[in-house]
Amino acid sequence: MSSFNNIGQAIILCGGKGTRLAPISGNIIPKSLIKIGRYPFIYYLINQIYSLGIKRIILCTGYLSELIYTDLNNFNFRNNNIFEFVFSNEDTPLGTAGALIKAFPLLKNHSSIIFNGDTYIKGNLKSYINKETSSNISMLTSFKYFSKDFGVTYCSKNNLLE
């Protein structure tokens, strides 16, 4: 059973090249650093993580990872002692599962919440996490009537992953 109070760290998957966003990023910045309004997208994720009371963030980086590191330093996230940032950098793209496997040795002995570095979840994450569940892992997805070549999950009528 998961409980929000057991979550001691967040993982942000931000190692992708963002080829679909090349017209916006120009392939010169990682997609998590593309500005939405005044700030890079990753700042909104970090603030959401902060609102959950989580202070340890593992960043699974890859493409242009040094820019993410520098940007977080420049914005003073790393120097204000609010967060402990830990970087797990992929020298070659490993995909989602590969990034998580590479970061596994960095995990401390408590539950984690994983965020995609290009996805913002609007809503009350605390209530979702605290919801009674009989499994050791949960995944929050959204229902769409269309599918793409990426980010698709298939569920049975019982809402179990197929």
Predicted regions and their residues:
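Conserved N-terminal catalytic core of the sugar/cofactor nucleotidyltransferase
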Residues: 2-12, 39-116, 125-127
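Conserved core of the sugar-phosphate nucleotidyltransferase
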Residues: 72, 121-162
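Active-site metal-binding loops of divalent metal-dependent hydrolases
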Residues: 17, 115-119, 143
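Short catalytic helix/loop segments, enriched in acidic residues and glycine
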Residues: 27-43
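Alpha-helix termination/capping residues and helix-transition junctions
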Residues: 4, 27, 51, 106-109, ...
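Conserved beta-strand scaffold positions in the cores of enzyme catalytic domains, especially
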Residues: 33, 84-87, 137-139
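Glycine-centered loop/turn positions within well-structured domains
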Residues: 19, 31, 66
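N-terminal nucleotide-binding beta1-loop-alpha1 segment
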Residues: 1-27
